Amino acid sequence: MVVRLPYVKGSILCSALAKGCGHNYYGEPAWPNDILYIFPVVILGTISFSLGLGVIENQAIGEPANPFATPLEILPEWYFFPTFNLLRILPDKLVGVLSLASVPVILVLTAFIENINRYQNPFRRPVASLVYLTSTCYALWLGYGSVLGISEALPFV
């Protein structure tokens, strides 16, 4: 059922529709069609997909936990690997804490570098892109070194 007929004599509407632009103001309304019929189908599909993945999942993944045995080396979660390795390889604790405090400072300075240039294209902001790529590669290298031994974890050595 069409709710409202379009006014096709207007040149702006015809030119916008010819280019594939414009909004779909005409046709079926969202209430009750989408909300009563499409949303429950999507919600039930998502729930059944999640339950299906839960049913076919392997039960035994890794070793069972033993609360009375301490592992040889305790590793943090994966997103703390670069900072863990940075604290581990620096000889002085004050230098390690200052280096960790410098990470948010570098992030804030990168945001200011991005605001100096008015362009949104990353290829037209080479300084900010270079800072971002360099720090990302160094963080990935630090994260990889955290799972190695201390003699192999030293970057740039």
From Swiss-Prot:
InterPro entries: Cyt_b/b6_C, Cyt_b/b6_C_sf, Cyt_b6/f_cplx_suIV, Cytochrome_b_C_euk/bac. The keyword Phosphoprotein does not apply. GO terms for cellular component: chloroplast thylakoid membrane. One of its GO terms (biological process) is photosynthetic electron transport chain. SUPFAM superfamilies: a domain/subunit of cytochrome bc1 complex (Ubiquinol-cytochrome c reductase) (SSF81648). It is a multi-pass membrane protein. The keyword Chloroplast applies. Its main location: plastid. The chain crosses the membrane at residues 35-55, 94-114, 130-150. It is found in: Plastid, Chloroplast thylakoid membrane. It comes from the Eukaryota. GO terms for molecular function: electron transporter, transferring electrons within cytochrome b6/f complex of photosystem II activity; electron transporter, transferring electrons within the cyclic electron transport pathway of photosynthesis activity; oxidoreductase activity. Keywords: Chloroplast, Electron transport, Membrane, Photosynthesis, Plastid, Thylakoid, Transmembrane, Transmembrane helix, Transport. PANTHER family: CYTOCHROME B (PTHR19271:SF16). The 4 large subunits of the cytochrome b6-f complex are cytochrome b6, subunit IV (17 kDa polypeptide, petD), cytochrome f and the Rieske protein, while the 4 small subunits are petG, petL, petM and petN. The complex functions as a dimer. This is Cytochrome b6-f complex subunit 4. It comes from Amphidinium carterae. The gene is petD.
